């Protein structure tokens, strides 16, 4: 009896232990994060002075399983930490090397100080520390980061020399060290950066020559406001975007090196008006080949001293006579040119009333804010120039209506040839037979803009100029209640005018590019104002005063497509299948206009469902168009790429710092997937294999049964099977991993238009047209 009771007690104990183990098992299995990564992120949290970040703790925790803010994982390993403008302080600490596979780290625009740690993770590919308070020198341990491709350390307090650490960093694509206190020459190992395309060094105290850069595949090089000297290597002058002002360069251009050619004994000296550089070099490669110190050094004595002296004097006199002749010739040309210009202006006066009579008057009449523009000739010239620019940027829409410049009227019947002339827009009887005036209409808009903005800082655009005081009044002093959203370029507020008219006011962050330079900001305003399409958010006005830079756009009451699909269940019900296809088509037309019709072409760079605004009729208005110059500069560019990639919109080539029109196409394909499935592009609440929408969806797009299961459940199966299949085919082409296999946006527009036409024909017999209105 006693043995039976003891056996029963043992069974009870065993069952109790088993129950405890089963209860504990889920909590153990949920601890997904690698322990080394947990220790590293705990150490980072303490070094940052324990900021208020959702999920973050000083000890333990599960960053991957609990989705800590700004932390992205791959399986159990932390791969990305993005904490931009999070008001962080403290330092980065010394525990970063404990991360096992951290690839991207972005702490831009915070208040982090101290020195940059020498214990950075060797797995790093992207490092963004711009806009902080880092001091000290750039660590030499960078040489161990052999996977590093992008590094932004700009806008800090770094000092000392750039370390000679680039020997093994052959994957580097972008480097931004601008706006620090760096000094000394460029390190020789920089010549090993065989994949470097962007190097920004402006606003430092760097010195020496640029010869170590001459064989690099650079597309962007900014060295302005430094102490660089010597001749500029000839190869650097072919860089598409080379900014070099504010240095001590000689007028002489250093020739390309040719080691096999010996120096000529009678080669001329440096020009007398430029001081000889102590380090004048034409060399490159591993050993810096310097020019032999023959007669390039005037202080060196030679046997033919008298002949050299005579030759020098002769060269000086020839130079003086040549300069004098050039001045005389320039004066003659100037006088003749002014006479010709007067004659030309006289002839143009005959045609100006006709050129502005129909096209220009529509623009003037539609603008109630003409009095806000600067008086005098600036406005008069602009009135005549704008219609000419418009011809270059006019669009051929696929069944869509193009907005008139600042008016509610539509020009649905006009198809304007971009290579044609202004005569096609007017009644023949109103055109004087002056061919010279018509030919001027084909002048590229950007050329005219650059020429004019270089002479004046006044606004050339006809959009309204608001004051800061008026915008404060209309936004309740930019109150939190009026805040619509916050992005990488600043915050957006709702403004309500006394008559009830609503606008969206974008307050640009003071750290964003072009913020300080008013001329560049006004040029940006002009460029945005020229982007006019029925499916693109229209610029209404701007503000540039008291160091504030603001852009005012039209307001769309139904918010964003992202909110409609993922937040507002009430309105989501109204998104029938046909309406979703129409939304995709209108968004595609906006990108087609930017890529293939707008002059000059434009890349969006930030295309996502949150930037697709919807008006009262659920019509598409794409926002952030024309802001690519802000996004493509410095740390903001890397931030844009990181965010798009982190949230599932980024094309695979983002990893290499590449952004082209085909990246916009990829992002558009992701938005189409959102319309198809009703899912977010990245949803950390879903199972790990379903968090990134593209990865989850691609294998199923060509499986009929799987495709039907992917469709947004809120559609309740109400969609044509063929239309669904065609929609999936377009998505599949847009999200191809190789950019060359993605279609042009005009092809996408054609495919979606054909889909709608087929459905129109199918529904005509039923009198049902669901592609219009809110249904």
From Swiss-Prot:
SUPFAM superfamilies: L domain-like, Protein kinase-like (PK-like)
Domain Protein kinase: 478-756
UniProt-reported outcome of changing residue 395 to L: In strain: cv. Landsberg erecta
Effect recorded for residue 386 to K: In strain: cv. Landsberg erecta
Residues with glycosylation annotation: 133, 181, 192, 250, 279
Biased composition (Pro residues): 256-278
Signal peptide: 1-31
Polar residues composition bias: residue spans: 367-379
InterPro entries per UniProt: Kinase-like_dom_sf, Leu-rich_rpt, LRR_dom_sf, LRR_N_plant-typ, PRK1-6/SRF4-like, Prot_kinase_dom, Ser-Thr/Tyr_kinase_cat_dom
Extra remark beyond the main annotation: Over-expression of SRF1B induces no obvious phenotypes while overexpression of SRF1A may lead to seedling lethality in both cv. Landsberg and cv. Columbia.
Protein task: Not essential for epidermal patterning and not redundant with STRUBBELIG.
Name this protein carries in UniProt: Protein STRUBBELIG-RECEPTOR FAMILY 1
Species for this entry: Arabidopsis thaliana
Name of the gene encoding the protein in the UniProt record: SRF1
């Amino acid at each position: 009896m006693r043995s039976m009771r003891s056996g029963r007690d043992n069974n009870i104990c065993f069952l109790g232990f088993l129950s405890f183990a089963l209860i504990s098992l889920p909590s153990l299995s949920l601890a997904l994060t690698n322990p080394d990564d947990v220790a590293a992120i705990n150490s980072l949290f303490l070094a940052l002075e324990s900021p208020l970040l959702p999920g973050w703790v000083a000890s333990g925790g599960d960053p991957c399983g609990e989705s800590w803010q700004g932390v992205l994982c791959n399986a159990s390993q932390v791969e990305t930490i993005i904490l931009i403008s999070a008001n962080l302080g403290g330092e980065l600490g010394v525990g970063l090397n404990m991360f096992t596979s951290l690839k991207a780290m972005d702490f831009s625009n915070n208040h982090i100080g101290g020195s940059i740690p020498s214990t950075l993770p060797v797995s790093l590919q992207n490092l963004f520390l711009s806009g902080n308070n880092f001091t000290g020198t750039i660590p030499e341990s960078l040489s161990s980061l052999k996977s590093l491709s992008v590094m932004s350390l700009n806008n800090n307090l770094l000092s000392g020399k750039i370390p000679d650490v680039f020997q093994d960093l052959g994957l580097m694509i972008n480097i931004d060290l601008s706006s620090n206190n760096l000094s000394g020459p460029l390190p020789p190992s920089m010549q090993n950066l065989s994949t470097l395309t962007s190097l920004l060094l402006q606003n430092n105290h760097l010195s020496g020559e640029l010869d170590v850069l001459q064989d690099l595949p650079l597309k962007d090089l900014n060295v302005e406001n430094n102490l660089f000297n010597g001749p500029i290597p000839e190869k650097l002058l072919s860089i598409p975007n080379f900014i070099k002002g504010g240095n001590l360069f000689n007028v002489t251009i250093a020739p390309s090196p040719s080691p096999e050619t010996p120096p000529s004994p009678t080669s001329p000296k440096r020009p007398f008006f430029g001081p000889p550089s102590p380090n004048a070099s034409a060399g490159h490669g591993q050993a810096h080949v310097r020019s032999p110190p023959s007669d390039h050094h005037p202080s060196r004595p030679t046997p033919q001293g008298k002949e050299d002296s005579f030759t020098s004097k002769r060269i000086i006199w020839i130079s003086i006579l040549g300069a004098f002749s050039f001045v005389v010739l320039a004066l003659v040309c100037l006088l003749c040119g002014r006479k010709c210009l007067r004659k030309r202006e006289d002839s143009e006066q005959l045609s100006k009333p006709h050129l502005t009579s129909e096209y220009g008057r529509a623009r003037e009449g539609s603008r109630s804010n003409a009095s806000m523009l600067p008086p005098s000739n600036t406005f008069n010239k602009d009135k005549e120039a704008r219609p000419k620019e418009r011809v270059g940027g006019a669009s051929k829409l696929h069944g869509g209506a193009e907005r008139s410049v600042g008016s509610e009227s539509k020009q649905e019947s006009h198809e304007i040839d971009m290579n044609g002339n202004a005569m096609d827009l007017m009644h023949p009887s109103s055109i004087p037979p002056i061919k010279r005036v018509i030919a001027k209409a084909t002048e590229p808009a950007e050329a005219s803009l650059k020429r004019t903005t270089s002479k004046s800082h006044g606004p050339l655009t006809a959009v309204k100029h608001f004051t800061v005081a008026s915008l404060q009044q209309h936004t309740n002093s930019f109150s939190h209640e009026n805040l619509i959203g916050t992005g990488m370029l600043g915050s957006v507020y709702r403004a309500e005018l006394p008559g009830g008219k609503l606008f969206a006011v974008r307050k640009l962050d003071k750290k964003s590019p072009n913020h300080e330079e008013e001329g560049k900001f006004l040029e940006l305003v002009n460029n945005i104002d020229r982007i006019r399409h029925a499916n693109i958010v229209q610029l209404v006005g701007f503000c540039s005063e008291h160091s504030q830079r603001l852009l005012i756009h039209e307001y769309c009451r139904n918010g964003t497509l992202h909110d409609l699909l993922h937040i507002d269940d009430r309105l989501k019900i109204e998104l029938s299948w046909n309406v979703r296809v129409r939304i995709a088509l209108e968004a595609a037309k906006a990108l087609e206009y930017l890529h293939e019709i707008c002059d000059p072409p434009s890349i969006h760079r930030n295309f996502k469902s949150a930037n697709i605004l919807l008006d009262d009729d659920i019509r598409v208005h794409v926002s952030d168009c024309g802001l690519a110059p802000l996004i493509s500069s410095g740390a903001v560019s890397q931030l844009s790429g990181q965010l798009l990639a982190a949230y599932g919109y980024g094309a695979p080539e983002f990893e290499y710092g590449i952004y082209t029109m085909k990246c916009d196409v990829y992002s558009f394909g992701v938005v189409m997937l959102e319309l198809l499935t009703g899912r977010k592009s990245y949803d950390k609440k879903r199972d790990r294999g379903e968090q990134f929408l593209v990865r989850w969806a691609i294998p199923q797009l060509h499986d009929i049964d799987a495709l039907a299961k992917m469709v947004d459940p809120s559609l309740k199966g109400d969609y044509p099977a063929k239309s669904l299949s065609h929609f999936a085919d377009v998505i599949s082409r847009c999200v191809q991993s190789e950019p060359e296999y993605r279609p042009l946006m005009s092809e996408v527009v054609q495919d979606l238009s054909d889909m709608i036409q087929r459905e129109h024909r199918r529904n005509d017999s039923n009198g049902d047209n669901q592609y219009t209105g809110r249904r």
